[in-house]
Design a protein with these regions (language model features):
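Hydrophobic packing and interface segments
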Residues: 1-412
Length: 412
């Protein structure tokens, strides 16, 4: 990971120069400071910090999970899930905190007095999202390639060539496999979702500056940040439902998603009264979309519940408890070719409902509030991100714990 971040740091430095020349230079007659480039560097640095924090959390929690599972499986589950929770709340909390500090700093430096200057302020801040996405590209794609290369390489060397079990201490590739889980599924996934959150929030902030009503009602511009903060609060309340002692881990994790979605749906209602009473009045392509408070609420809810549906559909097609994977396992009895054909067909089929969910969400949101509605829907889809990250972090931590147990020859 040190090598990855070194290469990434060099790339970000070069890209920052491009941002300076392409974006900040035209503003030099008005603003002497490279605001967009600075926001880009802050976004990239925050994303890398989130990835590092995730790696530290995963490596601290995995061996503790192994030890506690040897005593009581429920205690091991608690440690693994709490590790995921720390990762989730750190990432979303840092993303929101640094973005708010950046906005306040730029506001104090620029002192915007009219709509045009406010628009410039948030255009400068948009570099924050670009920085997060740049790191996400390396973390998700580069980390994912390393993860799969280490996984397949360890399996080929161990199970195929040497005929030894998976995660056997006799196979040195096992260590690379476990490290790969952290690099791709912790650091890479965290950077990816950080970039998505930063981009969608910055997009909503920029679009909101096209509304004179929202600029006059100053608090209304920060409505996207309020929605993200409500998501953190809803996820914090929801985490207490995870520690009901049960052997049904999958059910417990699904309850987390359901409860956080329902809570956030209710908690957003008081927040919509921050928006102008007469409507947001978003300008797009020469037309004004005067969406009401409740229409903005519908946009957020569409994104929120679409995200839940997509997660549940993904779980249905990939869980070993459900029909699709069982049918795929039966196809494996007839050879590798039926396995590949059925697996590919199953992957295609699993995308149908998510595509329709996304299409309907974008279409309805755009009809209600133009691009502002689409941005709010994206923020809504990421509303329960702390819980989603908790569940995503739980996977690699528990997987690493299983690998450590196998290498240590612990009892099942």
């Amino acid at each position: 990971m040190r090598k990855e971040y070194t290469a990434l740091g060099i790339f970000c430095a070069l890209f920052a120069v491009i941002v300076l020349c392409a974006v900040d230079m035209p503003w030099n007659s008005h603003h002497k400071f490279p605001y967009t480039m600075f926001a880009f560097i802050i976004g990239a640095g925050t994303s890398m910090l989130c990835g590092y924090i995730g790696m530290v959390i995963a490596t601290v929690c995995n061996y503790k999970t192994t030890y506690l599972c040897n005593i009581d499986r429920f205690d091991g589950f608690k440690v693994a899930f709490q590790g995921g929770q720390v990762l989730g709340f750190c990432l979303v909390g840092l993303a929101l905190l640094i973005l708010e500090i950046l906005i306040l700093s730029y506001k104090a430096a620029l002192k915007p007095e009219d709509g045009t200057e406010v628009e410039h302020l948030f255009e400068f801040v948009s570099g924050y999202g670009l920085g997060g996405s740049t790191v996400a590209l390396f973390g998700r794609v580069g980390g994912g390639i390393y993860t799969k290369a280490a996984d397949v390489g360890a399996d080929l060397a161990g199970k195929v060539e040497a005929s030894i079990p998976e995660d056997s201490p006799k196979n040195p590739g096992t260590i690379a496999d476990n490290v790969g889980d952290n690099v791709g599924d912790i650091a890479g996934m965290g950077a990816d979702l950080f970039g998505s959150l930063a981009e969608s929030t910055c997009a909503a902030l920029i679009v909101s500056t096209t509304s004179s009503a929202m600029i006059e009602t100053h608090e209304a511009i920060y409505f996207p940040l309020i929605v993200t903060a409500i998501g953190i609060a809803a996820s914090f309340i929801c985490q207490f439902f995870a520690y009901i002692k049960t052997d049904q881990v999958e059910t417990t994790l699904k309850v987390q998603l359901w409860v956080s979605t329902v809570l956030m749906s209710a908690m957003i209602i008081p927040a919509i009264y921050v928006l102008p009473e007469e409507g947001v009045g978003i300008m797009f392509a020469g037309d004004i979309y005067n969406a009401s408070r409740w229409e903005c609420y519908i946009c957020i809810i569409l994104g929120l519940w679409s995200g839940l549906v997509i997660g549940l559909i993904t779980e249905y097609y990939t869980s070993k408890e459900n029909t699709p994977t069982r049918e795929l396992a039966e196809a494996c009895e007839y050879g590798a070719a039926p396995n590949i054909i059925n697996g590919l067909a199953l992957g295609y089929l699993s995308t149908v409902i998510p595509i329709f969910c996304l299409a309907i969400t974008v279409l309805v949101s755009f009809k209600l509030a133009a691009m502002y509605g689409v941005a709010l829907a994206a923020i809504g889809m990421l509303g329960c991100l702390p819980i989603a990250l908790s569940i995503d972090g739980y996977g690699p931590i528990s997987d690493n714990a299983g690998g450590i147990a196998e290498m240590s020859n612990l009892d099942d």
